[in-house]
Amino acid sequence: MGTHALILAGGGLAGIAWETGILQGIADEAPATARALLDSDILVGTSAGSAVAAQISGSVPLRLLYERQVAEDSHELDPGVDIEALGRLFLDAVSQPDATARQKLQRIGVIAASSPTVSEPVRRQVIERRLPSHDWPD
């Protein structure tokens, strides 16, 4: 028999929740299909998909991973972003009629580079809480 792979895409926190929910939905409706997906020989993920791949390859059951996604309490950080203000900020950055595309992108880069971020240890702790194991496999 050939090698089977499960490929998971990115999508940030929404991607993690969506992919976990889809897998749980498949498990609820088509258990044999879910087993085939979860027992893939290779798990590949980009960004959010890599987090889901790491989670489903561990010892934590899919149902518990799903329940963590829908729980009221979360270890995720609240970005504290006003989405409308962010939209206006980017719209202002790109709607300068005399600016070149490069200048518009540079303006967005300046905004991004000057935005406050969490410290590396805080971010690392959030990611560690998502993972079922902190040991690297052989």
Where do the protein language model's features map onto the residues?
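Short, conserved catalytic/metal-binding motifs centered on acidic residues
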Residues: 49
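Patatin-like phospholipase
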Residues: 1-46, 54-138
